[in-house]
Amino acid sequence: MKELKYLFAYTVPMAAFVSFSSTGIGTYAAVIYAFVVLPFLDVVLGKNDTKWDESERKNRIVNTIFDWMLYLNLPMVFGLMSYCFFQVTTQSYTTSEWIGLSLSAGILLATNGINVAHELGHRQLFVERTMSKILYIPCLYMHFYIEHNFGHHMKVATPEDGATAKYNQSVYWFWITSVSKQYADAWKKQMELLSAKNRSFFSFYNDMLWYHLIQPLYILAVLVLFSQTAMLFAIATGVISFLFLECINYIEHYGLLRFKTDSGRYERVQTHHSWNSNFTIGRIVLYELTRHSDHHFKSSKKYQLLESHKKSPHLPVGYPASILMSLVPPLWFFVMNPRVPTEMKQSV
């Protein structure tokens, strides 16, 4: 029954539902839950770096409940966002309530949308990869599928990687550099993939073209089915969701670097090239994304198999608290700069 702990990841959609059903301070329910309740629970429950024996590992490989707990996020996310669009179409809100609703929807899309899409995007089954792309749609970040899988995992912890934050780089400047570079790199990688198979720019297999068709159609569908207000809200929440994603990218690799070998190539990705976190609640809610060192060490590993490595650098607090800390650059630098290995300290 240990696998059922990941049902706790559905508490974020539950908090989002409360936000969408409320007025006043209630519209901030998901925000309060994500950045007050979860950090508090991380402190109270602490860390867990337990490793599984061989029999438990084998059970986790074949037990499909881990997969279904991911799949259910798709109808949950689209169902809740549809409800939210209905609410913003039929109800009147103050400026403060609009902010609460937007942030709450952005948190839902980031945690149960982008995060789950990221996990499914590393799978081999066509249906799982398709589900991944669908979950990226409301986040307006479909190109991330290409750049992350074919770019970031190859270039992580190098100056060439847009998703690796440099030492002394603030999260706000990182938003600009990461978002712009990852988009450009996604196009570059797409053209390389097409060229490798002698396919033209207008090929059916140009996923980037499809993404630029599908995402506007999604926005248009929100306009037709709901309202202009809902359409603008959909755009705003999509942007908020991928900025939350970029906060996570920021804390996952901040200041860490791979060095070039005598051959001129970068050293192999090791467990010390990502910041790890074993805080229990953050691990569960984010489907073990916080064990990021192991994810980069072997990206084909499913979330339920990810483990902690002793040589991995560790964040002093869980992911929710780390995101908050990153939003205050002086505090982030004060806490994290001393933890970055001296030989890696190459400032932006």
For each of these PLM feature ranges, what is it?
Residues M1-L45, T64-Q87, S96-A110, F204-N249, ...:
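Alpha-helical bilayer-embedded segments of polytopic membrane proteins, i.e.
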Residues M1-T23, D53, L125-K133, I137-M208, ...:
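Cytosolic/stromal cytosol-facing helical appendages immediately following the last transmembrane segment
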Residues L45-N59, L257:
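Membrane-helix interface/capping segments
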Residues K58-V179:
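Intramembrane catalytic core of multi-pass membrane enzymes that act on lipidic substrates
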